[in-house]
Structure formats: structure tokens, C-alpha cells
């Protein structure tokens, strides 16, 4: 449909063999890994989303025609270290008092990294706006998987502080929840989709918004009224139930269904 396609990721090309996958498998027009960027600070084992987003806006602003770009950021990936980020304290709103009730170091680092990425993403949106790239663009944001933290004690504290009851099955259900949002030009009212949706629904949803016929997709546009289950690991999820380890739980009551 005439879109210039590009991929950007501040990591090496050998990780998940991304270069081969995107160039030969997806046949994209432009591939960018860490070697394509010049001014990105280290953030522990990875690179800072703040610098990555700035470089991404610079590259996208250089495209002459309409484009479809995929960005994969890494700062909120475990182990959540931010060593190397300049002036970090000035970019955080989370305080030591906020963190004081959590004993698990990994979970504390997770909260700090999320707080930093929240700042970096805000800067990213502002730079997109200043570059004139937001007016006619669909922006899709999603996470690829859960945090991967084994910190049940801290999660219990987090739930209790927000007057929520914590259970192991609820933790399993929430672990499959990832952030997913779409910003569409000229649509001001928020729409909250309550049905079960998955990453395989992203492509058909975008094509639906663009009015492009979808000849084949495993998923469905989230704007359809059809509900269905999808697989997470060895579990099955619908809007009503969650099945894992040969047991079925009601998602509203979190109680096991015996029959």
C-alpha cells in the first residue's frame, strides 16, 4: 500500500537473529540496530530508551513518504538496571519513601525503570509532536510480555496498599496482561475494550482503522463484536474463564470451576 517500512532496536542484530528475520522474513525496507545510532547512553546491560526515542524521531522525520515503523525498546527489561543514565534523579518522580515498603531489590528496580521509561516516553511523544509526526499517524504501544519477576511478597504489599485482595491465581491472570493502547488522529474520546484481546489482533486492528482489506490474519480487529479464546503458554483465556494446569477459574470471582 505504498508505505516505507523500517525497524529500530537498540540492541545487536544477532539477538533473536533480528536482522535476518526482518530483512528476509518480513522484507522491510530499512533495518536499524544499535550500530545505527550514535548518541544512546547505556542503561545497565542495555541502552536507554530516552536516547533511543530521540534517534528514532530523527530517523522517522527524514522519511519522505508515508511510513510504517516498528520500535522495540529495552530499558524495562529485567534486570532493570539504569547505570549510565545521566541525571537520573531529575527524571524520576518515584521517591525512596515510595520504595521503602518493598524489600525485593529486583522489584524496586522494576518500579524505578518503569518510572524512568514513563519520563522517556513522555519526551518521545513531545518530540513526535514537535516534528509534526503525530497529526496523521496511528501510534500503537504495547508490551511483549510480563515483567518476569518472582516477588510475591512485594506484590502482596502492592495489592494491599491499593485495597486489593491478592491471590496466586489473580497473579497468574494479571501476568498475561500487557499494556496495549492505540492513538488515532481526530478521535478524542477514549474507548476501553473489555474483551480478551492478544498481540495477534494488532495487525488486523490497524488494517481495520486504515480501511485496508485484511486477506489473512490469525487474530481479529478489536473493533469486532466477536469474542474468542487465545493461548498463553499452556493456558486458555476467554473474557470469562482462565484455564491452566487442567483447572478452570472464573476470571471475575477467581474461584475454581469444579464442573
Label every PLM stretch briefly.
Residues 1-259:
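Solvent-exposed soluble domains appended to multi-pass membrane proteins
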Amino acid at each position: 500500500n505504498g508505505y516505507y517500512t523500517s525497524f529500530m532496536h537498540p540492541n545487536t542484530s544477532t539477538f533473536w537473529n533480528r536482522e535476518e528475520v526482518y530483512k528476509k522474513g518480513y522484507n522491510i525496507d530499512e533495518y536499524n540496530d544499535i550500530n545505527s545510532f550514535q548518541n544512546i547512553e547505556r542503561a545497565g546491560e542495555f541502552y536507554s530508551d530516552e536516547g533511543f526515542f530521540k534517534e528514532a524521531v530523527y530517523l522517522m522525520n527524514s522519511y519522505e513518504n508515508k511510513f510504517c515503523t516498528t520500535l522495540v525498546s529495552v530499558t524495562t527489561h529485567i534486570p532493570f538496571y539504569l547505570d549510565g543514565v545521566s541525571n537520573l534523579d531529575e527524571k524520576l518522580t518515584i521517591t525512596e519513601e515510595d520504595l521503602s515498603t518493598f524489600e525485593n531489590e529486583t522489584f524496586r528496580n522494576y518500579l524505578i525503570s518503569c518510572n524512568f521509561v514513563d519520563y522517556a516516553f513522555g519526551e518521545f511523544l513531545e518530540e513526535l509532536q514537535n516534528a509534526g509526526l503525530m497529526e496523521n499517524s496511528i501510534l500503537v504501544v504495547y508490551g511483549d510480555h510480563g515483567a518476569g519477576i518472582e516477588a510475591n511478597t512485594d506484590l502482596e504489599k502492592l495489592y494491599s496498599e491499593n485495597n486489593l485482595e491478592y491471590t496466586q491465581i489473580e497473579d497468574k491472570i494479571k501476568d498475561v496482561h500487557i499494556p496495549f493502547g492505540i492513538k488515532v488522529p481526530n478521535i478524542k474520546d477514549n474507548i476501553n475494550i473489555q474483551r480478551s484481546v492478544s498481540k495477534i489482533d494488532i495487525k488486523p486492528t490497524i488494517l481495520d482503522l486504515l480501511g485496508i482489506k485484511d486477506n489473512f490474519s490469525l487474530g481479529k480487529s478489536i473493533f469486532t463484536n466477536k469474542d474468542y479464546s487465545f493461548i498463553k503458554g499452556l493456558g486458555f483465556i476467554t473474557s470469562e474463564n482462565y484455564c491452566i494446569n487442567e483447572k478452570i477459574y472464573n476470571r471475575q470471582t477467581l474461584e475454581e470451576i469444579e464442573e
